[in-house]
Regions:
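Charged, compositionally biased non-catalytic regions
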Residues: 1-7
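Active-site-proximal beta-strand/loop segments in catalytic clefts of secreted hydrolases
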Residues: 42-46, 123-124, 156-158, 184-185
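Short glycine-/acidic-enriched loop or helix-start segments at secondary-structure transitions
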Residues: 52, 130, 165
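Short, glycine/acidic-rich beta->alpha junctions
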Residues: 23-24, 129, 162, 174
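Gly/Ala-rich beta-loop-alpha elbow adjacent to hydrolase catalytic centers
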Residues: 122-126, 130
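A conserved cap/lid and substrate-binding interface adjacent to the catalytic center
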Residues: 12, 17-118, 143-145, 150, ...
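Serine hydrolase/lipase
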Residues: 101-117, 139-260
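Active-site signature of alpha/beta-hydrolase-fold catalytic machinery across serine-
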Residues: 132-136
Length: 260
């Protein structure tokens, strides 16, 4: 009508080929095969279960490389970044840790039939787990996953899965347009979890970190004022970290532990 197309028919179709069981804190993902043979991993977001929301609130930070004791019998080794100062959200790392054994197994099976192009997608909580899953797959040795699989990642309305140094690492791994984060600027989810920045989080070359040296040439009165102000701000930030660890770390951990 008037030269415009009334409806658009999809040029590609998708077929569900595998679903993981619900694991961890009600985490789940699907494997779809696109009509052009590209594999799409769709990671589910938060659902209306207390355990699923606990995963979001369990937002203490852990090193991006380490071990997680998932339960009495399962120790999960993971590497999500090269940087020692990269940290990630513990709740979503737990979700990722429960899903990736199924994901890796399916990818290896699909690889045997020639499928080497994979899209990783997740919305909301699923978007955060999609970030971490992509990072995990990047650092798996070739004995566990072939290195010529091509991944592209789409994170829709995803919250922040790690700190700034994890973000730097993820950006480098997916450089060249191999990852996209799609957000609505008015959405509150990408603003979470709450973050607290201290002097310890900054690069050593930042003059703010070594503010005492930076103020040596200032007049005595100015130097005393700056030192006093910095100490108060740093003390407030560190106090915020302690509350964060207490309520969004230790307290939530007790509830998560009961579930797992």
């Amino acid at each position: 009508k008037n030269g415009y197309q009334i409806s658009i028919s999809p040029t590609l179709s998708y077929r569900l080929i595998y679903q993981t069981p619900e694991v961890g804190l009600f985490n789940k993902c699907d494997f779809w095969m696109r009509s052009d043979s590209v594999i799409v991993i769709n990671i589910r977001g938060t659902i209306g279960k207390t355990e699923s929301w606990l995963e979001n609130f369990y937002s203490a930070m852990i090193p991006a490389t380490g071990k997680l004791q998932l339960n009495d019998s399962t120790l999960f080794n993971y590497k999500l970044a090269e940087r020692s100062n990269a940290y990630v959200h513990v709740g979503w790392t737990i979700g990722m840790a429960h899903l990736v054994p199924f994901i890796v197994k399916q990818l290896n099976e699909l690889y045997k039939t020639g499928h080497k192009e994979v899209i990783i997608f997740g919305h909301s909580q699923g978007g955060a787990i999609a970030y971490l899953t992509r990072s995990y797959l990047e650092y798996l040795p070739e004995t566990q996953l072939p290195k010529d699989i091509v991944f592209k990642t789409y994170c829709s309305a995803a919250p922040k899965p790690g700190n700034l140094y994890y973000a730097y690492e993820f950006d480098f791994v997916t450089r060249g347009g191999w990852a996209f984060r799609v957000v609505n600027s008015a959405d509150w989810v990408p603003e979470t979890p709450l973050t607290v920045q201290t002097l310890d989080d900054m690069n050593e070359v930042n003059p703010v970190v070594d503010y005492k040296s930076s103020t040596q040439s200032m007049p005595w009165l100015v130097r005393m004022y700056v030192n006093s102000a910095y100490k108060k701000m740093d003390k407030t930030a560190n106090k915020g970290v302690k509350y964060y660890q207490k309520y969004l770390g230790n307290t939530v951990f007790k509830q998560v532990q009961k579930t797992l």
